Amino acid sequence: MRAVVQKVKKSSVKVDGKVVGQIGKGINALIGITEGDTLEDIEYLKNKILNLRIFEDEEGKLNKSLKDVNGELLVISQFTLYGDCRRGRRPSFIEALSGDKSEKIYNDFVDLCRKEVPNVQTGVFGAHMDVDIQNDGPVTLLIDSKKVF
């Protein structure tokens, strides 16, 4: 599993012009899933995202986690995180897991996050979405459960 994690002042996602998820201060997490992802990958990514110390403490240092600041989480599926751009000009998405398997893993990830964070919002799995993100910092991190980077 992969994630692009962005600390935000606010973020929202629309499908067909209708807001389906929105948060205030927190994290916008774009999530990609590949063949072979398991509960271990889900747990790793969940623990990393919810406990990353990317929020300021009283001294202005990045020393607090989403959970520490009672932040909100917006989770959006994004298969293009497994796009391979090394050859040619059109990305290949063969590493992205598609269909029901991917949706189940995504839903399992969201469910586990909801057990630890009071406000977890989502986009619509597999839909074309318009995402508005007001970065805070900006702080943007890439996480891979296989520790590729």
From Swiss-Prot:
Keywords: Cytoplasm, Hydrolase, RNA-binding, tRNA-binding. Its EC number is 3.1.1.96. PANTHER family: D-AMINOACYL-TRNA DEACYLASE 1, D-TYROSYL-TRNA TYR DEACYLASE. One of its GO terms (biological process) is D-amino acid catabolic process. Homodimer. It catalyses: glycyl-tRNA(Ala) + H2O = tRNA(Ala) + glycine + H(+); a D-aminoacyl-tRNA + H2O = a tRNA + a D-alpha-amino acid + H(+). A motif (Gly-cisPro motif, important for rejection of L-amino acids) lies at residues 137-138. HAMAP family: Deacylase_Dtd (MF_00518). Belongs to the DTD family. Gene3D superfamilies: D-tyrosyl-tRNA(Tyr) deacylase. It comes from the Bacteria. GO terms for cellular component: cytoplasm. InterPro entries: Daa-tRNA_deacyls_DTD, DTD-like_sf. This is D-aminoacyl-tRNA deacylase. It comes from Clostridium acetobutylicum (strain ATCC 824 / DSM 792 / JCM 1419 / IAM 19013 / LMG 5710 / NBRC 13948 / NRRL B-527 / VKM B-1787 / 2291 / W). A Gly-cisPro motif from one monomer fits into the active site of the other monomer to allow specific chiral rejection of L-amino acids.
